[in-house]
Design a protein with these regions (language model features):
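Bacterial N-terminal signal peptides that target proteins for export
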Residues: 1-10
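Active-site environment of divalent metal-dependent phosphoester hydrolases
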Residues: 36, 63-65, 90-93, 121-124, ...
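Acidic/polar short surface loop at catalytic or gating sites that assists cofactor/ion binding
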Residues: 112, 116-151, 171, 175-186
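Active-site-proximal loop/helix segment associated with metal-binding centers of metalloenzymes
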Residues: 132-138, 162-209
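Charged helix-capping and loop-helix junction motifs
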Residues: 253-257
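N-terminal signal peptide c-region/cleavage motif recognized by signal peptidases
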Residues: 17-18
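Active-site metal-binding motif and surrounding structural segment of the metallo-beta-lactamase
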Residues: 64-116, 231-242
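Conserved beta-strand hairpin/beta-sheet module of binuclear metal-dependent hydrolase folds
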Residues: 24-73, 197-215
């Protein structure tokens, strides 16, 4: 049973830092709860740190949130060269360009290598016909242009990719158990005939001696589907999950399953 294989780790306080393996230290830099002078918002960002390198997963909503929270936690983000974005939504991509602008002055490669899943740059439309794109941009192509002008290179993934030692981006997640987990009313065409199922939703898996620890931005691909994708990379148990699961409207019965 999947319910026996995944232990949900609930983060109730911003800046909860966990040593979940000897290799990486994880620090949550943005979520909807704040404490001790930090900024809280509807968003997500987390930092992986090892002796070898630092990797950022998602960049928060407002451009200054991750910058501020990292500063008060004494986290040196100038060491971050690689970023994994879970999906295009602005509450996960809003800080990227500002982070690059600030830290490239200290490290020319800072925030320059960004991994996204196929479909990230698809143009989206609200049900009223207005456009929606990444990073607080309405037009996806404008976001891409602005980021690339700052020296950011996007690596588009169709399948999983090893980002660092024992750290993997899932790339595209096959929708096996659940086809879509997320908001409705968004489309991929101006005529509003093709519903957006956020095919670019991906997660990060960290391989430890005990198995996989999964980090999800929103879980639009479905948490079980994502766990299955990690096990297709290496058949180890998924014993921990961190981040957003988009289960806030789910019944208790659904959440427990």
């Amino acid at each position: 049973m999947w319910s026996k294989r995944i232990r949900y780790l609930n983060f109730l306080i911003l800046f909860l830092t966990a040593n979940v393996s000897a290799e990486y230290k994880i620090t949550v830099l943005a979520t909807n709860i704040s404490n001790y002078g930090g900024f809280g918002e509807w968003s997500f960002s987390a930092l992986y740190e090892s002796d070898e390198e630092s990797v950022l997963f998602d960049t928060g909503f407002h451009e200054d949130t991750v910058l501020h929270n990292a500063k008060i936690l004494n986290k040196d983000l100038s060491k971050v060269n690689k970023v994994v974005l879970s999906h295009f939504h602005s509450d996960h991509t809003g800080g990227l360009i500002k982070l690059r602008q600030v830290y490239k002055e200290l490290n020319a490669d800072a925030f320059s290598e960004v991994y996204v899943a196929r479909g990230f740059f698809d143009q989206r439309y609200y049900k009223d016909g207005s456009m929606e794109g990444p990073g607080n941009y309405r037009d996806s192509s404008e976001f891409k242009k602005a980021a690339e002008e700052e020296g950011i290179k996007f690596i588009i993934l169709d399948d999983f990719k090893k980002i660092s030692n024992n750290l993997y981006a899932t790339g595209t997640v096959e929708r096996v158990v659940e086809k879509y987990n997320g908001p409705k009313g968004f489309y991929l065409d101006k005529d509003l005939t093709i519903p957006d199922i956020i095919r670019d939703d991906q997660s990060v898996g960290m391989l430890t001696d005990n198995g996989w620890i999964m980090m999800s931005g929103c879980g639009h691909s479905g948490i079980i589907n994502t766990a299955m994708k990690l096990q297709s990379i290496k058949n180890e148990p998924v014993y921990g999950a961190i981040g957003g699961f988009h289960l806030f409207k789910a019944s208790d019965n659904t959440s427990l399953k």
